[in-house]
């Protein structure tokens, strides 16, 4: 299933997406994500089940981090590689995701050297890396020119139409950014 959160600035779309991604706890009430009750589940176990692409998360990446490390670290629900070890299948998956999103040539580049369009592609590859059950894309086309937006939406449409693709929540201001 795929959903869209469509609304104006300040409507709470990003707040809802952060709660759904288990990155923000609600101030009241109860929230279940992927069958798990927030506050009763180990967030470290829940994060790899949720792929998140958001400018807030991207802002936490260190500038010197390589594109490959940015994508790989999502396997553990972390930002940046620390002490984790990655094997060849992990590296192959990260490279394949970057390639599918038109960012294969960026593998060795540092995060700080990327344009906003390149960063968006890497962020989405990162969100898909753990093979999530739920994919949350918070304004994935923001900052892209028309051609870049169309390329990104085409890649997303292809990825999300594949068998076994994750459920998706897309946050946007624009109807034309909703993949078919």
Predicted regions: what they are:
Residues 72, 87-106:
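Conserved ABC ATPase "signature" region
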Residues 85, 110-114, 118:
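Conserved ABC ATPase signature
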Residues 131:
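Conserved catalytic motifs of ABC-family nucleotide-binding domains
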Residues 29-39, 46:
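Conserved ABC transporter NBD signature motif
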Residues 135-138:
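Catalytic Walker B motif of ABC-type/P-loop ATPase nucleotide-binding domains
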Residues 21:
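Helix-to-loop junction immediately C-terminal to a conserved catalytic motif
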Residues 124:
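Hydrophobic anchor residue at the start of the ABC signature
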């Amino acid at each position: 299933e795929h959903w869209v959160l469509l609304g104006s600035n300040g409507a709470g779309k990003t707040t809802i997406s952060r709660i759904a991604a288990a990155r923000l706890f609600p101030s009241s009430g109860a929230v279940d994500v992927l069958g798990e009750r927030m506050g009763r589940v180990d967030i470290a176990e829940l994060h790899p089940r949720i792929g998140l692409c958001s400018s807030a998360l991207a802002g936490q990446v260190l500038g010197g981090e390589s594109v490959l490390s940015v994508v790989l670290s999502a396997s553990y629900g972390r930002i940046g590689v620390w002490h984790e070890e990655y094997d060849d299948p992990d590296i192959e998956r990260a490279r394949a995701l970057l390639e599918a999103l038109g960012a294969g040539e960026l593998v060795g580049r540092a995060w700080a050297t990327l344009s906003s369009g390149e960063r968006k592609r890497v962020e989405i590859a990162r969100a898909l890396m753990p093979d999530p059950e739920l994919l949350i894309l918070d304004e994935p086309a923001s900052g892209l020119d028309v051609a870049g937006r169309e390329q990104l939406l085409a890649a997303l449409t292809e990825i999300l139409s594949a068998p076994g693709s994750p459920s998706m929540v897309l946050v946007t201001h624009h109807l034309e950014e909703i993949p078919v």
